[in-house]
Amino acid sequence: IRESLHKAMTQKGIRILTEAMLEGVRRGDDGLLHAVVSNGEALDADQVMLAVGRLPNTEHLGLERAGVATDKLRAITVDEFSRTSQPNIFAVGDVTNRVQLTPVAIHEAMCFLETVFKDNPVSPDHDMIATGVFTRPEIGTVGLSEEAAVKKLGDVDVFRAEFRPMKAT
């Protein structure tokens, strides 16, 4: 999927740099953005997009004092019922670094409520999550990645489809 999007964007004149760190950007008198990347290359562009990813925002929550375990990214580690290393503390959403999507966090919260307040243990299902990326071309996925499906199920069939808008047919 990434390769298809990369190819489509490249065909539209978008240059994509991977494994490069942005050292700085400034707007020149000519109105262009002048950027320097970690390999020393200087770039002139009308626009610069920097995709840096996201990290859980847990730094000032007092997790260490509470004895709540975190991983190397400082995400709160949880079991299948969103329980942390402290049996009376639960965590859901982006701070757990499971799936960083609002509908998933809401689902995790609903499972937490069912588990804790209704005494009906329910674990969130992260296997059938639909996603959409609003690029051109648009990207949508549902279910496990191929790698995760092979790991979980062994031999799998993979189906891919590319669609054109009806107006283009």
Over which residues does each language-model region extend?
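Rossmann-like dinucleotide-binding cores of NAD(P)H-dependent redox enzymes
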Residues: 1-34, 38-39, 98-106, 114-148
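Short phosphate-binding/catalytic loops that engage adenosine nucleotides
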Residues: 14, 68, 154
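General small-molecule cofactor/ligand-binding pocket signal
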Residues: 15-17, 90, 157-159
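Conserved beta-strand termini and adjacent loop/short-helix elements that scaffold enzyme active sites
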Residues: 19, 73, 159-161
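Short, solvent-exposed coil/turn elements at secondary-structure transition points
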Residues: 22, 28, 82, 95, ...
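Structured beta-strand/loop patches that form or line metal/cofactor-binding pockets in enzymes
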Residues: 26, 140-169
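FAD-site-proximal beta/loop scaffold in flavoenzymes
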Residues: 42-120
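Glycine-rich beta-alpha junction loops
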Residues: 49-54, 94-95, 130-138, 162-165
